[in-house]
Amino acid sequence: MPHSQKSRHCELEQGLQAPKEAQGLVGVQVAEAEKVNTTASSSPSTLIQGTLEKVSASGTPGTPQSSQRVCSPCTTIKATPWNQSDESSRSQEKKDPGASQALMLEKKVDELVKFLSVKYTTKQPITEAEMLKGVIKEHKDHFPPIFMQAHECMEIVFGTDMKEVDPISHSCVLLKSLDLTYDRRLSDDQGMPKTGLLILTFGVILMEANCASEEKIWEVLNIIRVYAGWKDFIYGEPRKLITRDLVQEKYLECCQVSNSDPPRYKFPWGPRAHAETTKMKVLEFFSRVSGSDASSFPLLYEEALRDEKEKAQAIIATMGGTTLMASAHSWAKSSSFSCPE
C-alpha cells in the first residue's frame, strides 16, 4: 500500500456551516480520516474533537489546493514511497533524536494497517502473536498504542470492525461496520473496502436533515482529499462510487432538484441502507469514535430514537400478534441508549 493517508488530517480547520452537534457528528470521521494523514504523536482525542467548525456553505465541489498541513500515522499510507520515507526519517532523526520514537511508531502503525488490510482482503483471522512477530518485532513494548491507532484507522477509513473469535489465542477477524453487506472490491484498486466512505456519506445525509445535496457531500469529502474525478487509492473514482454504484446498490437514492438548470442532485438514504442499518447505529458509530455517547447529540439522538420506535412498530404491524410486541420492544431497547432526562 503506498504511503499517503497522512495528508487526510490536513484541511480540518475548515469545517461545516451546520448546527454545532451536526458538525461534531461528521467532524469525528473527517478528523479520523484525515488522521490517516497526520502525526503519530498526535492524540486521537485532540484530533477528533472540534475539527470541523466552518466550511463555506455555498459553492461547488472543490479541487485540490496547496495549503499548510499537519499530518499523522494512518494518513501516511497513501503518499510517499517507503524508501523515500525512510531516508526522510533518518535525516529527521539526526536533526531531532527525540523524534525518532514518534517516527518509529508512525511507521509501525502504517505497517500494521497494511498487514490488517491484507488479512481483510484474504478473509484470514488475525492473531496477536503474528502481529508481534511479523510487524511489531523488537518494539513489543509499544504494541498497545500501535495497535490502537491501526485499529482506529481501519475502523474510520476502511469501515471495518474487529471481532474477537478466540479469546485464548487472541484471534480476531475484520468485518464491515454497522452490519453493512456492501462488498464492492475491484481488482484495480487492490480490493480495499469502501465502507468507510459509505458510513461518512450516511453521516452527512443524517446531518443534512436526511437529504444531502451533492455539493454538501463533496464539501465534506474534499476535506479528506477525496475529489470528484480524481481516482482515490482506497475508494476508486469517488463520483462513480457515490452517484452510480451506491445508487445501483440501493444504499443511496439520487433525486434531481426541482427546476434546477443545470440539473442538481440530492441524496437520501436508500432502501438497502434502511434495511441494513439505522440512524442510531450511525450516530453510535460516530459517538464511539469521538469518545462520547449518542446523547451528546440531543437533536440527532431524539430523531434516531424515533426511527428505532418506528421500525419496532413496523415489525409489529407486519408480523402481527401480541407475542411479537415484547420482542420488538426488546429489540428497540437493546439497539439504543436510554432516553436522557
From Swiss-Prot:
One of its GO terms (biological process) is negative regulation of transcription by RNA polymerase II. GO terms for cellular component: nucleus. This is Putative MAGE domain-containing protein MAGEA13P. InterPro entries: MAGE (IPR037445), MAGE_N (IPR021072), MAGE_WH1 (IPR041898), MAGE_WH2 (IPR041899), MHD_dom (IPR002190). Disulfide bonds: none annotated. Residues 105-304 form the MAGE domain. It holds the Pfam family MAGE. Residues 87-97 have a biased composition (Basic and acidic residues). Residues 1-21, 78-101 are annotated as: Disordered.
